[in-house]
Design a protein with these regions (language model features):
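Amphipathic terminal alpha-helices
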Residues: 246-261
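Conserved C-terminal active-site "lid" loop/helix of NAD(P)H-dependent oxidoreductases
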Residues: 195, 214-242
Length: 261
């Protein structure tokens, strides 16, 4: 019977779990919303013994991968998956980037090391851009007064709706090992996303600010230090994946529709 174990049942992995359970899979997992504690070696190893597939969404700890460090010897499964980041490509100056590009040149060197370690184990590595969806979108930032429009002309980012992410991982269950970018079709500036969300809400967008005026944290400033467009052609060709939400406009409309009484 198809049985998946997920390390790290967070926002994205919970959607994957739900989609697989709806398809008849048995899914176990660790994490704050999982059945098992990551440090419970005996229970985790028993669960890994029951699983036919293993997926990790656990981020690096320093330069190390916590899952591989602690349970790598138990990962002899034919199907391994890892949720990585398109940040491994670094800054491309707004140019398109696909899976043939070198990884490790950006600020996320630890993620690139973990990405490579999972690829070395013949895993399916899903490189993800900014993830958004219900409960985690521009609407929440606007409601919390945290939405910012930063004056950085020509800067763009890629993103993916969490439901399309889950569908991409499901499509990857029958795919050969390798890296797969799961991004929608329309890279766009963060400003464009905020402006569209405000338009849908009938609100005036926040004022345009410089990075200095916005008072962003160092982590947030790092987000704006990179500029790239993530290509999804390989996922379309090899996985047969097609995003249900091909751009942020479609995704935001659906989120708002679902949240309306």
């Amino acid at each position: 019977m198809a049985h998946l174990f997920i390390f790290g049942l967070g926002y994205s992995a919970k959607r994957i779990k739900r989609a697989l359970e709806n398809a008849g899979w048995t899914v176990e997992g660790s994490g704050s919303d999982g059945d098992l504690a990551f440090g419970d070696d005996e229970a985790i190893r028993a669960a890994l013994g029951r699983a036919s597939h293993v997926l990790s969404s656990v981020p690096p700890d320093g330069d190390a991968d916590p899952v591989l460090d602690r349970y790598g010897d138990a990962l002899r499964h034919e199907w391994l998956g890892y949720l990585s980041s398109s940040g491994v490509y670094g800054d491309t100056g707004g140019a398109w980037v696909d899976e043939s590009a070198p990884a490790g040149g950006g600020r996320r060197t630890a993620r690139a090391l973990c990405d490579a370690a999972w690829l070395a184990r013949s895993a399916r590595v899903f490189r993800l851009p900014g993830i958004y969806g219900p409960g985690r979108s521009a609407f929440e930032r606007i409601a919390e007064g945290k939405a910012r429009r930063i004056d950085l002309p020509d800067q763009v980012f890629s993103r993916v709706h969490v439901e399309d992410l889950a569908r991409g991982v499901l499509a990857g269950l029958d795919a050969p090992p390798g890296a797969y970018n799961l991004a929608d079709d329309l890279p766009a500036s963060q400003n464009a996303v905020i402006e569209e969300a405000c338009r849908l809400l009938g609100m005036v967008p926040p004022p345009l600010q410089s990075l200095e005026e916005a008072g962003l944290s160092s982590q947030a400033r790092g987000f704006y230090a990179e500029n790239r467009r993530v290509a999804n052609g390989k996922a379309r060709r090899v996985l047969g994946w097609e995003p249900r939400f091909p751009d942020y406009r479609a995704g935001l409309r659906d989120i708002l529709r679902r949240s309306s009484p």
